[in-house]
Amino acid sequence: SYYEHNKVESAAVILPRLLGGESCALVSDAGMPAISDPGEDLVRLCGEHGITVSAAPGPSAVITALAMSGLPTQRFTFEGFLSTSNKSRKEHLETLRHEHRTIVLYEAPHKLVETLGDLYDVLGDRDIALGRELTKLHEEIVRTTIGAALEKYRAERPRGEFVLVIRGAPVEKGPRL
C-alpha cells in the first residue's frame, strides 16, 4: 500500500521492483489515482526513473461534479483541497476572488461549514453546487448559493466527501463604443 504517511518507505520497495521489470497498478478508494492523492508523488518518481506510466480513465469527482452542477463547464480551475491553516486557506481564496472560470474544490465534511463561511466572506454569495458521495449510493447534488449552503450545513451535519463547484467572478463589461 502507498499512502501519505508511508510513501517514502513504500517507494523504496515499489521502485526497485518496477525497475526490475515488474508491473504494478495504482488504485485508489477515493476517486482517480494521483488527483489530490499521494499517488501523484509515485507517478513523479516513476517519471524521474524512466518508468512508463499509463492511465486508465476512471472515476473523477471533479468532472462528475462539473457535469452535474449546472454551472459553466467550458473553462474551470481545479484547486484540490484547501489548506487546513486558516491563514493559508484565506490567502488561497483571495487569489480566486477575481477568477472568472468556474472553481472546483474538494472538502472534507468536518471542514465544510468553515470553508463555506470563508468562501462567503471572500467570494460573496455566488452560485454553488455541492456534490456529495458522487457515484455512490447516497450521491447528492445541492444547487444553491454559498450563503444558503452555509445555513443548510450549519443546521444539518455534513456527511461524506464533498466537491464544491463555484461560479466564477462576473466578467466586467466595459463601456460600449
Regions found by a protein language model. Give the residues of each.
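Short, well-ordered secondary-structure micro-motifs
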Residues: 12, 37, 65-67, 89-91, ...
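Conserved phosphate/pyrophosphate-binding and hydrolysis machinery centered on Walker-type P-loop NTPases
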Residues: 32, 59, 82, 86, ...
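General beta-strand structural signal in soluble alpha/beta enzymes
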Residues: 28, 55-58, 105, 130
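A contiguous loop/helix-start segment that scaffolds small-molecule binding in enzyme catalytic cores
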Residues: 19-24, 102-177
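Short, acidic/turn-prone active-site loops that include or flank metal/cofactor-
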Residues: 1-8, 59, 80-85, 133-136
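Class I SAM-dependent methyltransferase SAM-binding "motif I" and its flanking Rossmann-like core
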Residues: 41-99
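Class I S-adenosyl-L-methionine
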Residues: 1-56, 64
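Short, hinge-like loop/turn segments at secondary-structure boundaries
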Residues: 16-19, 42-44, 69-74, 122-123, ...
